[in-house]
Amino acid sequence: MKKLIALMMALLCVMSLVGCGGDVKNVKITEYTSEKYSNDEIKDAIDVAIDYFTKEFEGCTLTEITYLGDDENDDWQEFADRNNATDVIVLVSSFDVDASGGDGSLNPNSTYTNWKWILVRTDGGKWKHVDHGY
């Protein structure tokens, strides 16, 4: 029984050291205007990107995010096409990376700007994250 308790305590300690994902508590959502999407549609897309960042960008802090804009957004329609979707929305963000380098694919102690988030949906449904990066 003592071994089981010791094992459970050790497991609890290890789990407490595991990161909780990206930090989004102070993210600035920059104002945007669109003739293509409503404010609610854009906010829903931003929420999807923030949720993904929270889960997958351990050691990173999202500092700003916004809608790319109608004119540039249309250039990304191929993502909707290849994902059998009708709509695409592109967000742009900035985030800081701590000394850990996130998951190892990012430069430690750096800031990423103009980072794109590409989301698609079909016929006004829910946005789905399909890609991100430069």
Locate predicted features.
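Low-complexity, compositionally biased segments
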Residues: 3, 16, 90, 99-101, ...
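Residue-level signal for the start and early helices of compact helical domains
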Residues: 8-11, 28, 110, 118
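Flexible low-complexity loop/turn motifs enriched in small/helix-breaking residues
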Residues: 19-111
